[in-house]
């Protein structure tokens, strides 16, 4: 995982976060850092597609998916990269943050008071289906 830290350093991650990465060298922690600092990550296109490819199979359980095809329900933190094609379902007061990048396509179904924040970057496409009780906030960069 030193290559992840090295790439973050090349992209001028702040010293505080660099030290956190050096101290906690595990995938779960790195993925949690992604969501806590997703503004920096999105601005610097981090993690890179080659890094995600290298660690495919290790990031998914922590919410980062590359070229994923399928349906996921009620997961609070998700990020899709590459050419993912997904359906995301949220209900029963679920609150979530979803980042969709590159060439990914997503259909998001929100109902029963779910609150979803979606960041759309690059050439990603999103279709929203929601009932009157759900709130969906979309930010396109």
Kindly give the residue locations of the regions a language model identified.
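Short, glycine-biased loop/turn motifs at secondary-structure junctions and
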Residues: 1-102, 107-141
């Amino acid at each position: 995982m030193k290559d992840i830290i090295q790439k973050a350093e090349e992209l001028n991650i702040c010293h505080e976060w660099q030290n956190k990465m050096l101290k906690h060298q595990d995938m779960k922690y790195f993925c949690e850092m992604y969501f806590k600092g997703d503004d920096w990550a999105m601005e610097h296109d981090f993690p890179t597609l080659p890094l995600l490819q290298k660690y495919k199979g290790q990031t998914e359980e922590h919410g980062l998916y590359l070229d994923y095809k399928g349906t996921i329900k009620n997961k609070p933190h998700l990020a899709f990269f590459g050419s993912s094609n997904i359906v995301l379902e949220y209900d029963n007061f679920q609150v979530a943050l979803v980042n969709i990048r590159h060439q990914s396509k997503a259909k998001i179904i929100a109902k029963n008071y779910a609150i979803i924040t979606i960041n759309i970057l690059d050439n990603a496409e999103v279709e929203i289906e929601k009932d009157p009780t759900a709130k969906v906030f979309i930010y396109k960069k």
